[in-house]
Amino acid sequence: PMTDDTARHNEKMAKKKAARDKIMATKSGEKGLIVVHTGKGKGKSSAAFGMIFRCIAWDMPCAVVQFIKGGMESGEKKLITEKFADICPFYAMGEGFTWETQDRARDIEMAEAAWEKAKELIRDTRNKMVLLDEINIALRYEYLDIDAVIAFLKDEKPPMTHVVLTGRNAHEKLLDIADLA
């Protein structure tokens, strides 16, 4: 039997559904997102690797480029390189955090090489997602030109490719173009 509470609830939910349907009608459908994981706490790379593992689980080609942590071992790197390298190539391009290397010219060279690899992987439309792990550090220390990175993401990222960028202190310009941050 329909009670007054049930009727009110149904009416309220019908209004919510109509409002939600109106919002969803304005959405342009699926597209590849630019996602920035930044902040002071831990978990930025872990969250991004969760997204990569989801791609792997659904047999969606993806790729990882590590900008800074290249010399460091991690469970994510071990699992991907040993078990899923065919669907998710993993490029550890850095040599460690800059305060460990203390060689700015070498850090810039490594960051530029990582960025070239990243662009190649992003342009490859087979990749549904590309993770640029710790790129925000490379941008913060000006190892890469923020305007060049922004221009590439805006102008050359294929429409259905997701690009995930991690690291503390994300540049304001990067946050401005992000779909999720």
Regions found by a protein language model. Give the residues of each.
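Generic detector of well-ordered alpha-helical packing
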Residues: F67, E134-I135
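Short gly/ser/thr-rich secondary-structure transition/capping motifs
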Residues: K17-R20, E112-E116, V163-G167
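Conserved P-loop
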Residues: L33-R123
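Extreme N-terminal, non-catalytic leader segments
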Residues: M2-L33
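Generic hydrophobic/packing signal
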Residues: T38, I52-I56, F84, K128, ...
